[in-house]
């Protein structure tokens, strides 16, 4: 990562997993997009998808030669967050550690502010 201040952290573990998944898709233009939608048991939920397009206003954060992309609407809910990838007994997944969330559901997939 560069010395430029970014509003959230894209961990090495997450970047390594993204890089592995992109290599499997054989499309080097893919980026991991994280976004917020309404729903879930706590009001908002996180979403992850691969995207090969950038939209106007998207923020791109690079780590280990891969990119994380966030749209402006979602970014306001993610400032200060950490995007990570964890593996454990309950499976493996991308996770968001969000200091803006006042509460989260039991599985961590949705949150409220």
UniProtKB/Swiss-Prot annotation:
Question: What superkingdom heads the lineage?
Answer: Bacteria
Which segment of the chain is annotated as a signal peptide? none
Give the molecular function GO annotations: 2 iron, 2 sulfur cluster binding; 4 iron, 4 sulfur cluster binding; iron ion binding
What cofactor is needed?
A: iron-sulfur cluster
> Mind telling me which GO cellular component terms the entry cites?
cytosol
User: What is the UniProt remark on how the cofactor binds and its stoichiometry?
Assistant: Binds 1 iron-sulfur cluster per subunit.
Looking up InterPro entries in the UniProt record yields: FeS_biogenesis, FeS_cluster_insertion, FeS_cluster_insertion_CS, FeS_cluster_insertion_RrpA, HesB-like_dom_sf
One of the Pfam families matching this protein, by short name: Fe-S_biosyn
What SUPFAM superfamilies does the entry give? HesB-like domain (SSF89360)
Q: NCBIfam families given for it?
A: iron-sulfur cluster assembly accessory protein, PRK13623.1
HAMAP family for the chain: Fe_S_insert_ErpA (MF_01380)
| Annotated function | Required for insertion of 4Fe-4S clusters for at least IspG.
Subunit text: Homodimer.
Q: What is this protein called?
A: Iron-sulfur cluster insertion protein ErpA
- The organism named in the record is Glaesserella parasuis serovar 5 (strain SH0165)
Q: Which gene encodes it?
A: erpA
